[in-house]
Amino acid sequence: MRYSVVIPVYNRPGEIDELLKTLTEVTYKSFEVLVIEDGSTNTCAHIIDRYADSLDIRYFQKENTGQGFSRNFGFKRAKGDYYVVFDSDCLIPAHYFDAVNDVIDQHNGIDCWGGPDRAHESFTPVQKAINYSMTSLFTTGGTRGNRHHIGSYHPRSFNMGISKEVFAETRGYIITRMGEDIEFSIRIQKSRFNAHLINDAFVYHKRRTSFKQFYKQLFFFGRARVNIWRFHPKELKVVHLFPLLFAVFLIYSAVGLLFNFPLSKELMMLYLVFGVVLMADAYRIEKSILVALYAAAAGFIQLTSYGLGFLREIFRANKEQGDSIINTD
């Protein structure tokens, strides 16, 4: 068996149903599925039963330990040569494993891979806008997986695969949440394994369904970036300050308009131009005025919430250690 698909889930039976349905429709069939119920009160046991005949599926219930350690739980019980992890809110296109197989066969085996995410046609306008914001060069600076990726590529565990040798060497996740996937990806590469970005191995990632949920998630992501520094100090770069600067100057310019602060009008004009750029680019991709408007809002929410989360955690880190934590190399 080539692949073991490991899916941790916490109180989301509806998402698991949709994900498993897409896995029944993939063209490559040499894989098993391990669903890890991570201490849920609203379990998906009844959903798993529906797929017993159409998928090689195993279901485990355990105490809540978080998604990172739940993936380790699955890896230890996996039978495949490669371990694939998806988030429960993903939909898998039919060609996914074919795209990965092509790269594995071309390189006579690979250590680790990840792929991008896209918006499915069934997504709501808000979901499409959030997907745009989370994948756009203008809002991520090319730090996430796409064709315009800048710098070292670190697969994210909404769409990631590793060989069983990688797991044997690294022992998997050492933190269970708050940047656990990036920390794992960094450690994989430090162990001299290679990570491949496979653009055709994309998934449809629902992410959050409201801007309030999106704000909370990105605030957490900002905190997670500082948490990663605790394990890998050199991985915190100047580029990670950009959302913080975005948030600080946005607040300054907004308050400054009320109290006539210096340069507040000029700064606000720059933010307006940035918003127009986001709308134009989102409209080019989605061909929807509503999605374009939402995309501009999502971009501002993403950068501001990430920056504020980063700021909160950096204060905590400075209390723990008096050193400077920004690597300028």
Question: What would you call each of these model-derived segments?
Answer:
Residues 62-78, 99, 150, 154-158:
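Glycine-rich, basic loop-to-helix element that forms the pyrophosphate-binding segment
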Residues 119, 140-165, 176-177, 183, ...:
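A recurrent flexible, glycine/aromatic-enriched loop bordering the glycosyltransferase active site
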Residues 83:
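Short aromatic/hydrophobic "clamp" motif used to bind/position activated sugar donors
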Residues 22, 37-46, 65, 87-93:
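A conserved acidic beta->alpha catalytic loop
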Residues 43, 90-103, 186:
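Acidic donor-binding/catalytic loop of UDP-sugar-dependent glycosyltransferases
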Residues 174-236:
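Catalytic donor/gating beta->alpha subdomain of glycosyltransferases that bind UDP-sugars
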